[in-house]
């Protein structure tokens, strides 16, 4: 049973993951029918508390909450009392006193959502914490895969890019291995974290090996903002040896799909012809993200304290 919070997929059960995905199916049907003002969370409040920049995640959560009838509050660290020295815990106490029902937090420090969840009555959702996890991105990725293939059993998911700094890669790895998929990772050695094989991933020795027979090809952004020092010679060198172009997809399964959590560096992780091809699901991922986050917000509020408000 889904608990009070969603802090990561490392300790999430298969049952919880499938519950969210199953609920999201109905939410997407409502979205595609243009039913964007539902009463499910009427009278509830969802706050996004972001200490890092975001377009997709923040907007997706805000729309998900509004489509379900909830009120929304957006807080950026740059324009809040954080600039005056307020701690995360004190910010949490303040938001709790205002009777928020759900707090979606993005923070540069790994573990920040877990810390916040220990000090507030509101449900806490991890919208990305440092290089740790990004569970809702992985959930929308799973939804996109299942929508195409129907099941995860036997799927080969190739993840190429900046694995070391990617919270998306970690959440995908944690969830996909539980769901029965094979995860293969490929990146420069300087961008491959230690221990991923112990977590269930296979590390490919070449781009061709990573892509061979892959059902899903997922590119990851080079996170220059998290890098200190030269981890590879140049973006052009990276694109030449690690990027994915149309000519490389001949190694993948003929019915493969291409995914990317965004934002995409065109011509670096993926070429434009790959991004814009018919088998690219990058735009569909964005729509699926709204449906998945609608499902998550609905389930968290429903399950917490029997559906009672934070009063």
Where are the model-predicted features located?
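Rossmann-like adenosine-cofactor binding region
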Residues: 196-273
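Phosphate-coordination loops involved in phosphoryl transfer and adenosine-cofactor binding
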Residues: 41-46, 153-157, 255
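Phosphate/diphosphate ligand-binding glycine-rich loop within oxidoreductases
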Residues: 35, 39-143, 266
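Glycine-rich phosphate/diphosphate-binding loop of Rossmann-like nucleotide-binding domains
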Residues: 51-63, 147-220
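Short, structured coil segments at secondary-structure junctions
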Residues: 68, 119-121, 179, 197-200, ...
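Positively charged, low-complexity intrinsically disordered leader regions
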Residues: 1-59, 63
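Adenosine-phosphate binding glycine-rich loop
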Residues: 255-256, 261-311
């Amino acid at each position: 049973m889904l608990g009070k919070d969603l802090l990561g997929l490392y300790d999430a059960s298969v049952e919880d993951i499938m519950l969210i995905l199953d609920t999201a199916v109905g939410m997407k049907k409502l979205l595609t029918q243009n039913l964007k003002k539902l009463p499910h969370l009427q009278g509830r409040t969802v706050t996004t508390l972001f200490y890092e920049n975001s377009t997709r995640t923040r907007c997706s959560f805000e729309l998900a909450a509004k489509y379900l009838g909830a009120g929304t509050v957006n807080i950026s660290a740059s324009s809040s009392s954080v600039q005056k020295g307020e701690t995360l815990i004190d910010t949490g106490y303040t938001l709790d006193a205002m009777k928020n029902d759900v707090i979606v937090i993005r923070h540069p420090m790994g573990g920040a959502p877990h810390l916040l969840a220990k000090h507030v009555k509101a449900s806490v959702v991890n919208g990305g914490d440092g290089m740790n996890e990004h569970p809702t991105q992985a959930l929308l990725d799973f939804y996109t895969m299942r929508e195409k293939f129907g099941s995860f059993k036997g799927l080969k998911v190739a993840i190429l890019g900046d694995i070391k700094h990617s919270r998306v890669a970690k959440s995908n790895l944690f969830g996909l291995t539980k769901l029965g998929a094979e995860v293969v990772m490929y990146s420069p050695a300087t961008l491959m974290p230690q221990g991923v094989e112990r977590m269930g991933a296979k590390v490919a020795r070449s781009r061709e090996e990573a892509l061979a027979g892959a059902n899903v090809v997922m590119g990851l952004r080079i996170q220059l903002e998290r890098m200190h020092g030269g981890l590879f010679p140049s973006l052009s060198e990276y694109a030449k040896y690690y990027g994915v172009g149309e000519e490389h997809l001949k190694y993948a399964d003929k019915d493969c799909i291409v995914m990317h959590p965004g934002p995409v560096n065109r011509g670096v992780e993926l070429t434009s012809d790959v991004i814009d091809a018919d088998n690219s699901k990058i735009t569909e991922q964005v729509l699926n993200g709204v449906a998945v986050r609608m499902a998550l917000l609905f389930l968290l509020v429903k399950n917490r304290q029997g559906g009672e408000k934070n009063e």
